[in-house]
């Protein structure tokens, strides 16, 4: 099985400084095949924030696949927001907004940019970019696990309004179903959750896993402490572990500890919990 560490919503510029070292140590100990970061590397897209984010990524194992989030688009500078929306992200993190990795012949993982200058908080995709991502995934070997990394969610917890769903989600999911996408790794909500697309989209023969990661390092915690996910996957099964920051209360010391795991097996319609 391949191991993917999924981090999201780092928010350099407003971080829990005590968690940084422990996170680097925890991720390194897991010896992942891929580290995926699903956006919001910075708080306000400032150069100094991107500099710290770049240094942090340099402390993590490779290969990595990273996509931007809405906080990586300038907020207060209107000219930069609309004319140079991701220029700093491209300069400090990666020029590729839709990266793609093939790990061996059994894991295809694609990045999808959902950040837009005109939506401020929300995200959106278009048919052209989703088609491009799907073509890459479809070209992978038949038995490869197919994963998409995006900042904005393709599914939501009960009671959360659909306005937080990525724009054109239903159009995108129809295309992802054709490319047999297995898993979505997303962020934005600062809350960890596992769900399946079949309950929302109801596409016959397709139900992908949606792994929502909390914020790995932000001091702006909402529903949980700093957290990240670990996905172990092959074509027939998936195992997800959820790691949460636990402070000892001694000068901010602490560690990321696992809260157990959930297991899923594949059948003809997608994934089922074991």
Language-model region placement:
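Charged helix-capping and loop-helix junction motifs
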Residues: 21, 49-53, 126-131, 162-172
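Conserved beta-sheet core of the metallophosphoesterase superfamily
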Residues: 162-236
């Amino acid at each position: 099985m391949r191991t993917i560490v999924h981090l999201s919503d780092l928010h350099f510029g407003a971080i829990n400084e005590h968690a940084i070292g422990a996170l680097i140590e925890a991720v390194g100990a897991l010896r992942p095949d891929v580290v995926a970061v699903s956006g919001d590397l910075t708080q306000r897209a400032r150069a100094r924030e991107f500099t710290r984010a770049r240094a942090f990524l340099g402390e993590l194992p490779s290969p990595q696949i990273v996509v931007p989030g809405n906080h990586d688009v300038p907020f207060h500078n209107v000219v930069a927001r609309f004319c140079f929306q991701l220029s700093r992200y491209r300069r400090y993190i990666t020029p590729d907004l839709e990266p793609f990795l093939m790990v061996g012949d059994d894991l295809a993982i694609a990045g999808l940019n959902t950040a837009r200058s005109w939506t401020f908080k929300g995200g959106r995709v278009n048919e052209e970019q989703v088609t491009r991502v799907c073509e890459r995934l479809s070209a992978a070997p038949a038995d490869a696990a197919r994963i998409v990394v995006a900042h904005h969610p393709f599914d939501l917890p009960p009671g959360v309004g659909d306005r937080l769903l990525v724009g054109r989600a239903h159009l995108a999911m129809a295309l992802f179903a054709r490319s047999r996408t297995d898993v979505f790794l997303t962020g934005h909500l600062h809350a960890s959750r596992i769900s399946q697309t079949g309950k929302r989209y109801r596409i016959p023969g397709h139900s992908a896993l949606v792994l929502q990661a909390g914020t790995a390092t932000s001091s702006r915690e909402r529903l949980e402490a700093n957290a990240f996910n670990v996905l172990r996957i092959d074509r027939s099964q998936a195992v997800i572990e959820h790691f949460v920051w636990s402070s000892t209360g001694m000068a901010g010391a602490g560690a990321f500890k696992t809260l157990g795991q959930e297991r899923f097996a594949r059948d003809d319609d997608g994934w089922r919990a074991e």
